[in-house]
């Protein structure tokens, strides 16, 4: 496990977060949203990598490296980084990385160069009818100090601020109809709680058209009959109440992104689950 790099100087960060990279102001908390790349803001990228690694290690993951930066962040046609900046504290409070579907490149085998492509197979229907109108999201994080369980009111709107940025993408790119990406659940998460979440997602949001399929499907280990009896409602809302109650009984919370996406989006698809390859 490498030691995480020291924070990047605030003056250096401010110099790279120039006005031409500012996407918009947030609806709440008076923060600022920027879009940068490794090529135009290398020091901001380092700070993002530092904050990602801290946040992911705290959740039971992380790369184990000094920064969480990979080839998709630094390649020739890199993922863009959407970051929320607190101008008062002069610090980053969270971010996503994203790639517009109509900018996706393909390798010599016709495979899309996507961060999820090593874990999932994409159908021809998805590649032709969905990808050009899609944004792939990944590496979402909220800086540890702004996570609501730790920060109280300071972190209350951190996720909302990030979503302001995603909403702005649909304005500047009006052809965007869909967002997709993977949500990670670490091995440290309670196994039965994980199975409950997966069963719930597959029941209410399953991808019946097999647009995207896992290369290494993760099997639910908990007794299926027990899960069927537990989640016995046709209503998503009623089953969600049960899920929330049962996961809390295990001493865990539903992961923030699972909670946010399922509650906020009516047209959601869960494309099964892939074990990390």
Residue map of PLM features:
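A structural signal for well-ordered alpha-helical scaffolds and beta->alpha junctions
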Residues: 10, 41, 49, 254-255
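Short amphipathic alpha-helix that is part of the acyltransferase structural core
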Residues: 25-70, 80-100
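Short acidic (Asp/Glu) patches
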Residues: 61-69, 75-79, 99, 109-126
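Conserved N-terminal entry element of GNAT/NAT acetyltransferase domains
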Residues: 2-39
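Acyl-donor binding region in acyl/amide transferases
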Residues: 103-265
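Conserved small/polar residues in nucleotide/adenosyl-binding loops
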Residues: 266-276
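A short acidic/small-residue loop/turn micro-motif
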Residues: 100-102, 277
């Amino acid at each position: 496990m490498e030691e995480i790099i020291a924070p990047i100087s605030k003056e250096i960060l401010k110099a790279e977060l120039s006005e031409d990279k500012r996407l918009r102001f947030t609806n709440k908390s008076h923060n600022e949203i920027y879009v940068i790349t490794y090529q135009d803001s290398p020091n901001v990228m380092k700070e993002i990598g530092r904050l990602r690694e801290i946040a992911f290690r705290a959740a039971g993951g992380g790369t184990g490296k000094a920064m969480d930066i990979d080839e998709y962040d630094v390649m020739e046609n890199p993922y863009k980084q959407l970051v929320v900046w607190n101008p008062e504290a002069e610090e980053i409070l969270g971010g996503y990385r994203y790639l517009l579907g109509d900018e996706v490149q393909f390798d010599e085998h016709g495979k899309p160069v996507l961060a999820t492509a090593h874990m999932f197979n994409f159908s021809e229907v998805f590649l032709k009818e969905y990808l050009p109108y899609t944004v792939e999201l990944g590496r979402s994080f909220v800086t540890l100090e702004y996570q609501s369980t730790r920060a109280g009111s300071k972190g209350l709107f951190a996720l909302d601020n990030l979503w302001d940025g995603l909403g702005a993408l649909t304005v500047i790119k009006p052809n965007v109809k869909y967002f997709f990406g993977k949500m990670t659940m670490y091995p440290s998460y309670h196994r039965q709680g994980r199975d409950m979440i997966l069963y719930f997602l597959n029941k209410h949001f399953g991808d019946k058209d097999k647009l995207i399929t896992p290369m290494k499907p993760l099997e639910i280990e908990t007794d299926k009959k027990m899960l069927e009896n537990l989640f016995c409602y046709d209503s998503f809302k009623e089953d969600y109440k049960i899920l929330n109650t049962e996961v809390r009984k295990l001493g865990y919370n539903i992961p923030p992104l699972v909670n946010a996406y399922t509650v906020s989006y009516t047209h959601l698809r869960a494309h099964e689950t892939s074990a990390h390859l």
